Amino acid sequence: MTSITDSAATALQLIASGDAGLLAIVGRSMAVSATACALACGLGLALGAWLGVARFTGRAAVLSLLNTFLAVPSVVVGLVVYLLLSRSGPLGFLGWLFSFKAMVLAQALLVLPVVTALTRQVVEDAEGIHGEQLRSLGARPGLRSLLLAWDERYALLTVLIASFGRAISEVGAVMIVGGNIDGFTRVMTTAIALETSKGDLPLALGLGLILLGVVLLLNVLIALARRWRERSESNEGGREGEREEGRGVPVRTVEAAP
């Protein structure tokens, strides 16, 4: 117990003092995950929104494959990226292996199915509510996907935040393709694994506390996004009611029983 207490105290001192090595690892981890999420979300939002409204032969098979990718272990993604970027692989000429770019690619491939699947579900649910009205106005699938995605932007904001949490907490893929090189490809999760095996518990615990803080912050942002969405929908409903009253249209009528 004393060892744990001492390690926790030292970890808090490292955080409070702004240890250069710790901050470098945290900054690199945030940069990798943010870049990967930006790339994955740019493609995943568009693809998921289209899948939410499109109807084509083989759609069920595509959705089954997409759902399968949700359960792919991160180490398998790391292995695939490693094989692609190795010298004998098809992308070996890029020279990305054991680099920042390799970790971004691995995390982007890991997050892409999550963003696509969640976006598809959100847009498909919205399509079930508003799709018939949009179709009656002549909106084609591409336009409907954009309109519905914009209408569900608060829900999709939650998807983006959740995808960042998935990326920053990943360890297997970045360990394989990044190599955990000190000062170059060492991020929070790989550093925690390494420092724990070396017995440097204060640094590992300090990074763990920061990682927990990041995850907690993401959960708070998700809760705020949901509340923001509920408040926005409530305000829009109130303004619609006021417009109906202004036109002389009763918003709600109650008939008395005879």
Model regions and ranges:
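Hydrophobic positions within alpha-helical transmembrane segments of bacterial inner-membrane proteins
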Residues: 33, 37-49, 75, 79, ...
